[in-house]
Regions:
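Structural/interface elements that position substrates and couple domains in central-metabolism enzymes
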Residues: 1-231
Length: 231
């Protein structure tokens, strides 16, 4: 609404096309995903539709607010689903159970549980940002999003907790394989691997790190890390 006020009487041909593709998969997903277009002027929609039909098979017209919420909901939905897995992983961790085993048995012959994803680091420049944007849009009443962030952001602490259960862990070489927020990218924004790395440094541990997409002066090869790491 603030942007609409700023642009009022300045550009009636403004069209908003929210981006919903997975990072590093744009050339694969752009031709497959429906393209949402939001605007107030019919002629602007028709001209933008003509453009996007060159790369998209389906065009869906919405209001600007609908388009923005669809984008935010898409990422918040994924972020919350990952938080469910991470919360269940946390419960297993606190009870000395193997979450992967529990999850596999849950899903064995039981199709209704197949939507439960693996646990793990959930971050990056989109999922967290859009979930928090919804929180601020709702004047901090998006409690589910806040709870999801609390769960997901705590996973590095659980790893530290598991590490401390190893005998003489302070004398071990700790290998951290992967520094970016996800695989096949050099993007470290909001990466929980970096959060974990900083926590390990504060413990004054011997740390080895490797990421084939994100090179640092302290980085070594994946093979060398695996060969030299104790944990």
């Amino acid at each position: 609404q603030k942007i609409k006020k700023i642009l009022k009487n300045k550009n009636s041909n403004l069209v908003y096309g929210p981006e919903r593709i997975v990072q590093s998969k744009s050339l694969i997903e752009l031709p497959k995903l429906p393209q949402i277009l939001a605007c107030e002027k019919k002629s602007a929609f028709e001209s933008s539709k003509k453009l996007f039909l060159k790369i998209s098979k389906k065009i869906i017209k919405t209001s600007i607010l609908e388009a923005e919420l669809i984008k935010l909901y898409s990422n918040a939905n994924r972020y919350i689903n990952f938080a469910i897995a991470n919360q269940l992983y946390t419960i297993c961790h606190l009870n000395n159970l193997d979450f992967k085993r529990v999850r596999n048995i849950m899903q064995d012959g039981y199709a209704r549980n197949l939507n439960l994803t693996n646990a793990g680091f959930t971050a990056g420049p989109c999922l967290v940002k859009d979930t928090m944007q919804l929180k601020y849009f709702t004047k901090n009443s998006f409690s589910l999003g806040s709870a999801a962030m609390k769960v997901n952001e705590n996973i590095p602490n659980l790893i530290i907790d598991k590490l401390k259960k190893f005998n003489s862990y302070k004398s071990k070489k700790i290998g951290l394989l992967g520094l970016t927020f996800k695989g096949e990218t050099d993007d470290t924004r909001d990466s929980l691997s970096i959060v974990l790395l900083n926590k390990l440094k504060k413990l004054n541990l011997k740390i080895l790190q490797s990421d084939e997409y994100y090179k640092t002066k302290n980085g070594i090869s994946k093979k060398e890390l695996i060969n030299k790491s104790d944990i």
